[in-house]
Regions:
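Intrinsically disordered, low-complexity Ser/Thr/Pro/Gly-rich regulatory segments
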Residues: 1-54, 58-262
Length: 262
């Protein structure tokens, strides 16, 4: 097996190790292509694309939308010097075309076991792992240099991305969840907390809610758990904001009070 293949597999294993703790489901079919149905989609050299790649599909129920979100994911594993705007532009362009086809493709739905009658959305996720752990720049600066307006994003399409620092942070949280469960401080069953919003109410059972992709990049992640023989019911909160001013914490505490958590 080549070194490149080994590096690519690291990203696959890492993504599964992370997202299972956020209660995402991984479709068993991985590293598979599906048929391109748009003659306007062209690859390198201007040749029409025959297929689109699919590294892995994650999915979860969105409690605000009341539907299942499928994340057609492109797993990238780059060395620190190869995380460039040019390379990211190519990855985003490929993912844009893949999602454009996936959203209306019968073969994609059949491949990933999506019922035609199921309320769902298909989105793209670009997962960029730095395998030599040397990338110390803000990933968002590289993304900002990509001319997103020039990408072939179809109307209604949503793309998400996680960079090296996002992945390190989420891996750390996943390991902490694993540790808390192992030490009996967090029950094996838990849920991610979603308050009713002013314009949007949460739908479905409050328990076994997954962390949405928006939650994973939000200022904080809240886990809610029931009481056990050793532990009272409560919350675990992971904070993901700069923590640079007193006003920031005042707003955070006001939010917790508004959620009736204090």
């Amino acid at each position: 097996m080549s070194e490149t293949k080994n590096i690519d597999e690291i990203a696959g294993r890492l993504s599964k190790d992370i997202f299972k703790h956020f209660l995402w489901t991984t479709h068993p079919k991985t590293d598979d292509n599906f048929e391109c149905a748009n003659e306007k989609h062209v690859g390198e050299g201007g040749k029409p694309k025959a297929t689109h790649p699919g590294d892995v599909v994650f999915y979860y129920r969105d409690p605000y939308l009341g539907k299942t979100v499928y994340l057609h994911t492109d797993l990238k594993s780059y060395a620190k010097d190869t995380i460039t705007s040019t390379r990211l532009r190519g990855a985003f362009k490929s993912l844009c075309m893949a999602i454009d086809c996936a959203r209306c493709s019968d073969s994609w739905r059949a491949k990933y076991s999506v019922d035609d009658g199921e309320a769902h959305e298909v989105r793209g996720l670009l997962f960029v792992h730095n395998h030599d752990n040397g990338y110390d720049k803000p990933f968002y600066e590289a993304v900002d240099k990509v001319n997103l307006q020039a990408l072939p994003v179809a109307p209604g399409t949503q793309l998400h991305y996680l960079g090296p620092h996002d992945i390190q942070r989420l891996y750390s949280i996943a390991n902490d969840i694993l540790r808390l469960k192992g030490e009996g401080e967090l029950p094996s069953t838990y849920t991610f907390y979603y308050p009713d919003l002013v314009m949007t109410r949460r739908q479905g059972d409050v328990w076994d809610q997954s962390a949405t992709i928006e939650t994973l990049t939000a200022p904080y992640i809240i886990i809610k758990h029931r009481a056990t023989e050793e532990q009272s019911a409560g919350y675990v909160i992971y904070y993901n904001a700069p923590a640079s001013s007193p006003e920031e914490f005042e707003y955070f505490l006001d939010s917790l009070s508004r959620f009736q958590m204090l």
